[in-house]
Structures are given as structure tokens and as C-alpha cells.
Amino acid sequence: MAKLFFRYAAMNSGKSTQLLQIANNYESMDKKVALYTSAIDDRYGVGMITSRLNIQRESNTFDAGFDFLAHDYGDTACVLVDEAQFMTPEQAQQLHRLAHKRNIPVICFGLRTDFQGHPFPGSAWLLSLADDVEEIKTICHCGRKATMHIRIDGDGRRVKEGPQVEIGGEARYRAVCGRCFHHD
């Protein structure tokens, strides 16, 4: 029986690298995978899943109006979703149905919370619906386990207000532990 998996972490933890490794594992056994990433995240080009190890793959994109159930997955062995925090609650429900009604494993990777510690709606629903939830670990600059992230400006100063979604990588965000998150 297929499952819905959610693998979450702070930024710069290797989520995209793991997703690309899983895709490679399936494809090395001549199995077909369906790759998705958010159309919002265009740091490396629209429809590109890119790891910080400079591994890159083309991908399908989803936006708020995308319906995962409308696609014909045919002989797809696994559905892999990067940047899953940008999904809508309805899309998280669609992926749950896809795993359980069409018997296709779905593995989602994303952030749990934003730079203010607020949950992303897509992630909140994945945490509720996923059959298997796994935290991918990374470390804070102080050496503790990073579970949060902060937004920084061009001078490296913390930004505490602003829109929930602002695309950026290491130049805009840092993974931090809870203690450093609350440090003023």
C-alpha cells in the first residue's frame, strides 16, 4: 500500500538533494517518477529542482490552481514534490488521495515554518495527513540542531516582518536553532 510521506527541515538541510537522489534511485531501476516543484520558487529557473550541490533537474510546476489529481500518472512509480510548503491545503489533500486511491507513493519535501515561526498552510496539512513524517536534520551556526530559519537583509541583519513568502536562498535566510531564533 502506497503512502504519503512528508520530509521537512530548516533551509539548507539537503531536502532537494534527497529528492533528486530518490528520483535517481527509481530511474536507475527503470521506474518512472513525476517531479514537481512550486512555480513560485524561480531562483534557478521556473521548473528546476536544484540542490546546493549543483545537481539540477527539470520538473513539472504547481501553482495554487494546480490539480494533482487531474494528471494521468500511468506507470509512474513515485511522485516527488519539492518546495511542498507552497501547496494549498487542497493540494495536500489531493496528494493524500493520490497515494491511497491510486496506490502511488508520494514523497513531499518542504519547510515546516516561515521566518517568523508560523506554519505554512501546505506544510500544516501535510503534517496532519502524511502517513510518514520525517525531520531532516541540519545544524545552526552555534552547533545545535537547526529547526527554524530567519530572514536576513543585505547586511546580514535579521528581518522580523514582511510577507510570508519571499524567495531567496542562503543570501536571504539562515537555518537556526530555537535558542538563536529567539535571540534578539
UniProtKB/Swiss-Prot annotation:
<feature type="binding site">
    <location>
        <position position="142"/>
    </location>
    <ligand>
        <name>Zn(2+)</name>
    </ligand>
</feature>
<dbReference type="GO" id="GO:0046104">
    <property type="term" value="P:thymidine metabolic process"/>
</dbReference>
<dbReference type="GO" id="GO:0004797">
    <property type="term" value="F:thymidine kinase activity"/>
</dbReference>
<keyword id="KW-0808">Transferase</keyword>
<dbReference type="InterPro" id="IPR027417">
    <property type="entry name" value="P-loop_NTPase"/>
</dbReference>
<dbReference type="GO" id="GO:0008270">
    <property type="term" value="F:zinc ion binding"/>
</dbReference>
<dbReference type="GO" id="GO:0071897">
    <property type="term" value="P:DNA biosynthetic process"/>
</dbReference>
<feature type="binding site">
    <location>
        <begin position="82"/>
        <end position="85"/>
    </location>
    <ligand>
        <name>ATP</name>
    </ligand>
</feature>
<keyword id="KW-0237">DNA synthesis</keyword>
<dbReference type="GO" id="GO:0005524">
    <property type="term" value="F:ATP binding"/>
</dbReference>
<dbReference type="Pfam" id="PF00265">
    <property type="entry name" value="TK"/>
</dbReference>
<feature type="binding site">
    <location>
        <begin position="9"/>
        <end position="16"/>
    </location>
    <ligand>
        <name>ATP</name>
    </ligand>
</feature>
<keyword id="KW-0547">Nucleotide-binding</keyword>
<keyword id="KW-0862">Zinc</keyword>
<keyword id="KW-0963">Cytoplasm</keyword>
<comment type="subunit">
    <text>Homotetramer.</text>
</comment>
<keyword id="KW-0479">Metal-binding</keyword>
<protein>
    <recommendedName>
        <fullName>Thymidine kinase</fullName>
        <ecNumber>2.7.1.21</ecNumber>
    </recommendedName>
</protein>
<keyword id="KW-0067">ATP-binding</keyword>
<feature type="binding site">
    <location>
        <position position="140"/>
    </location>
    <ligand>
        <name>Zn(2+)</name>
    </ligand>
</feature>
<dbReference type="InterPro" id="IPR001267">
    <property type="entry name" value="Thymidine_kinase"/>
</dbReference>
<feature type="active site" description="Proton acceptor">
    <location>
        <position position="83"/>
    </location>
</feature>
<keyword id="KW-0418">Kinase</keyword>
<comment type="similarity">
    <text>Belongs to the thymidine kinase family.</text>
</comment>
<feature type="binding site">
    <location>
        <position position="177"/>
    </location>
    <ligand>
        <name>Zn(2+)</name>
    </ligand>
</feature>
<feature type="binding site">
    <location>
        <position position="180"/>
    </location>
    <ligand>
        <name>Zn(2+)</name>
    </ligand>
</feature>
<dbReference type="GO" id="GO:0005829">
    <property type="term" value="C:cytosol"/>
</dbReference>
